[in-house]
Structure formats: structure tokens, C-alpha cells
A protein has these predicted regions:
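N-terminal secretory signal peptides
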Residues: 1-4
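N-terminal export signals
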Residues: 7-29
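Flexible C-terminal active-site loop/helix
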Residues: 13, 39-51, 69, 77, ...
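C-terminal segment of N-terminal export signals and the immediately downstream linker at the start
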Residues: 24-55, 75
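Metal- or metallocofactor-binding catalytic centers and their adjacent structured scaffolds
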Residues: 38-46, 62, 75, 80-148
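Conserved, mostly hydrophobic/aromatic
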Residues: 72, 78, 137, 150, ...
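Metal-dependent enolase-superfamily TIM-barrel catalytic cores that perform enediolate-based chemistry
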Residues: 153-268
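Catalytic alpha/beta core domains of metabolic enzymes, predominantly
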Residues: 256-261, 267-273, 277-348
Length: 382
């Protein structure tokens, strides 16, 4: 049977990517780390928290001024790792669903926190779905293990902290005067953003871009959040965006419109990035040939462990990679930033959009993701 272009790309690249993932060791750690661990038990705790946003945040799906999150802790031999689940309402998780899931997590039966794969596989098997709740355990466990090793995760993975990219700052859909104000704050503020991300997908797309261009000419990225429904109009819009110094377009059309997204990618003068269409590792080969690249978010991928596997597989398939976030504290943003030295683009501004962060960690200096040398995910509690 004759294969179409998308199926050929998918099958030809998948074998190589799967082989590469199969070569990953199930245990990153030398015996000297494992053998020095005591035989204590891990204690797991969680509590609900609500992030207050600095501004009402509007995307194609909805608007909100708060984000429910769950804060997690794993304690072992006097050392505590911190984690987080960020749960924007439109994604389907909540304080109630996270409480139900996390109440089933029992880490007391594990004596060795370095058994990351086994522990996280068991967590994943508790129930389907719940990616953010699962990520909160994953992040806390990674933070704990990094602290026990006295190493940040970018160093454990062998990444160069000096190769982090610039991060975007997100401008949500809003009235022109608000957009102008947010844009001016972003480009003239202490972080010195060199690239902005613009939420589109409604009827005022061109007005949004033109309003921003009245303030600054810095490069832009665009996230349509599945808002465009006609592929011909989407292509016309992308050509117009290219003329206005846009670098790439995220999720141009609904994730269910697979053939239409593939057509847009084939005809687009800009890279397209799958976001809502790419949740976990299994989705990466499906996105190959449909999008130019993928947007990895810990709250979709169930955490750092699977996110790194997604990064490796996407690279083996020749795809572009960006690392993104939800509105989060510096805990989850710093965890995601550990992967940033290996991506093309970063969208790690979620902690900068909230007014009640309870951690300090990764910062933005002259527009660039700047990692700390603190062990684990690189955070301290405020």
C-alpha cells in the first residue's frame, strides 16, 4: 500500500527514535550513590494552593485570574524535595481530582528514592490521566534525588547551563491599551525580554500583532491555541505573520484536525509546533510529519522523566523542540528549565505571571533562561 508523506515520515523516523530511547539506561546513577543510601522510608505530603495572576489571562479557550495548584513534598532522611501540579481549569484537573489521585500515592514502601523509573511507573499506573498530579510527584522526587546527590539536574543530565535559550514572555488576548501596557512592561522591565509570545485564535488576531508592533519590533512567537478552523485562512495568516517578524506558530488548528494541521505545516513559511496535540511520549511520533516540532510541558508529560524522553525522541526524529509551562510557581518552572539547554525555544515565564510565588529559582537575565547551581530542581522556599 502506498504511504502518504506524513505516514512515511512517521514510520521512517520512529524506528531510529525508539532504538535511541531503548538505549537509555534505566538507572542514571553510579553504584556509589545507591549504596550510600540509608534504608529509610519516604514520606509524601501535599496541600492545595491557589495562584493569583497579576493580570486576567485570556487565551482562545477562556479567561481566568487564578490557577489552582497542588504543592507536594517528599521527605527522606531529613531531606525534602518539592513538587507542584498546576491545573488550569480548561485542562480538566482540579484540587478535587488531584486530591483523589495523590491520596492513593504511597511512597513508604520504597526504600531507595533513586529507583526513579520503578517509582514513577507505579505512580503512573495508579489511574489514567491526571498528568499534572503525576508531575507533582515526579518533580518532588527529582528535587529530592538531586539534593541527595548535591547536584542540579542539568548537571546530572550532562547539560551545559550556558546554552540556555532566551525565553518568551506571554501577552494574552486583551484590549489594545492593556496589550500595549503589557508589551512595554515586558521589553523595558528588569528581565529584558528579547522575544514575546502572543496568544491569538480569536477575531482580533491582526489587531493584537499591530498593537504590539506599535510598541516594539522584537521577534514574536504566536500561539493560536487551536483557534483557527480553516486551513486556507490559517496559511494566509501565517504568511502575514511572517511579514511581522513572527518566528513560529503553535497549534494553529484543533488537534483533532490532523490532516489539516499537516497540510498547514507543509505549506507554512514558518515552523509549526504541536502543543495541545502533544501530551506524552506516545504522541511524539504521531506529531512527526504533522508539525515541525513539539512543545513539551511537565504538566502534560507527567514530569521531568518523561519530558526528557520526549526531547530525545523528538530530536532523533529531526523535530524542533520547545519547553513550555503553565502559570506555575518557580518550583515547576525551575524543574522544566533543567531541560532548557537542549531545546530550540523556551516559554518559561509562568512564575512571572503570578503574584504569590512561594519559591525562588530559575530567573530571566537579559531575556535568557538563567539556571541556579542549587541541587535538585534549583529552588529555595521564600
Amino acid at each position: 500500500m502506498k504511504q502518504n508523506r506524513r505516514d512515511f515520515l512517521k514510520t521512517s523516523g520512529l524506528a531510529a527514535g525508539t532504538a535511541l530511547l531503548g538505549g537509555l539506561s534505566n538507572n542514571l546513577f553510579a553504584n556509589k550513590y545507591i549504596n550510600t543510601m540509608k534504608s529509610g522510608k519516604m514520606k509524601f505530603r501535599f496541600r492545595p494552593y491557589t495562584l493569583e495572576l497579576k493580570h486576567v489571562f485570556t487565551v482562545a479557550e477562556a479567561s481566568r485570574s487564578t490557577t489552582p495548584i497542588m504543592l507536594t513534598e517528599i521527605e527522606y532522611e531529613g531531606v525534602t524535595g518539592y513538587g507542584e501540579a498546576s491545573m488550569p481549569p480548561y485542562l480538566g484537573e482540579s484540587h478535587a481530582t488531584a486530591t483523589e489521585f495523590l491520596s492513593k500515592v504511597d511512597l513508604s514502601r520504597y526504600s531507595n528514592p533513586f529507583d526513579l523509573d520503578d517509582i514513577l511507573s507505579d505512580i503512573d499506573a495508579i489511574a489514567p490521566g491526571n498528568p499534572a498530579a503525576k508531575a507533582s510527584v515526579d518533580i518532588a522526587l527529582h528535587d529530592l534525588v538531586g539534593k541527595l546527590m548535591n547536584q542540579p539536574w542539568f548537571n546530572i543530565w550532562g547539560y551545559d547551563k550556558n546554552k540556555t535559550p532566551n525565553t518568551t514572555f506571554t501577552i494574552g488576548i486583551d484590549k489594545p491599551d492593556v496589550v500595549r501596557k503589557k508589551t512595554q512592561e515586558a521589553v523595558s522591565g528588569s528581565e529584558g525580554f528579547k522575544i514575546l509570545k502572543v496568544k491569538l485564535g480569536l477575531d482580533n488576531d491582526k489587531e493584537m500583532i499591530e498593537t504590539i508592533r506599535s510598541v516594539t519590533n522584537v521577534p514574536l512567537t504566536v500561539d493560536a491555541n487551536q483557534g483557527w478552523k480553516d486551513k486556507e485562512k490559517a496559511i494566509d495568516m501565517i504568511h502575514w505573520l511572517k511579514e511581522h517578524n513572527v518566528v513560529f506558530v503553535e497549534q494553529p488548528m484543533p488537534k483533532t484536525m490532523v490532516d489539516e494541521n499537516a497540510w498547514v505545516t507543509e505549506h507554512s513559511p514558518l515552523p509549526t509546533m504541536g502543543d495541545e496535540a502533544v501530551q506524552r511520549l506516545v504522541d511524539v511520533p504521531k506529531a512527526h510529519g504533522v508539525y515541525s516540532g513539539i512543545n513539551i510541558k511537565l504538566m502534560k508529560s507527567t514530569g521531568m522523566r518523561e519530558a526528557q524522553k520526549m526531547l530525545i525522541l523528538a530530536r532523533s526524529l529531526g523535530m524542533k523542540v520547545m519547553i513550555g509551562c503553565m502559570t506555575e510557581t518557580s518550583c515547576a518552572v525551575s524543574a522544566a528549565s533543567q531541560l532548557s539547554p537542549k531545546v530550540d525555544w523556551a516559554d518559561l515565564d509562568g512564575n512571572l505571571l503570578v503574584s504569590n510565588d512561594i519559591y525562588k529559582g530559575t530567573t530571566v537575565v537579559n531575556g535568557k533562561v538563567t539556571l541556579t547551581d542549587l541541587p535538585g530542581v534549583g529552588i529555595t522556599k521564600i
